[in-house]
Amino acid sequence: MKAKELREKSVEELNTELLNLLREQFNLRMQAASGQLQQSHLLKQVRRDVARVKTLLNEKAGA
């Protein structure tokens, strides 16, 4: 997910996106804990996407 795409979204859409990413992160962590996760790079990717969304939410709150 690109930051440019996220900047075009509203605060409500960003909050929805954040919830979806957190759910996905939880599911990936459960798969990793049970040894079922084949693509371990997804954990890092989702974690960074969560950080991007949170950063944009903070920027929009300050502006």
UniProtKB/Swiss-Prot annotation:
One BP term from GO: ribosomal large subunit assembly
Keywords on record: Ribonucleoprotein, Ribosomal protein, RNA-binding, rRNA-binding
Disruption of the gene: reported phenotype: Cells missing both S17 and L29 grow very slowly and have a rather unstable temperature-sensitive phenotype.
Keyword Ribosomal protein assigned: yes
Domain of life: Bacteria
CDD domains xrefs: Ribosomal_L29_HIP (cd00427)
Any single Gene Ontology cellular-component annotation: cytoplasm
Membrane spanning residue stretches: none
Molecular function GO labels: rRNA binding; structural constituent of ribosome
Family: Belongs to the universal ribosomal protein uL29 family.
Function as written in the Swiss-Prot or TrEMBL entry: Binds 23S rRNA. It is not essential for growth.
Database matches in NCBIfam families: L29 (TIGR00012)
Subunit (UniProt): Part of the 50s ribosomal subunit. Contacts protein L23, trigger factor and protein nascent chains. Might also contact SecE and probably does contact SecG when the SecYEG translocation complex is docked with the ribosome.
Protein name listed in UniProt: Large ribosomal subunit protein uL29
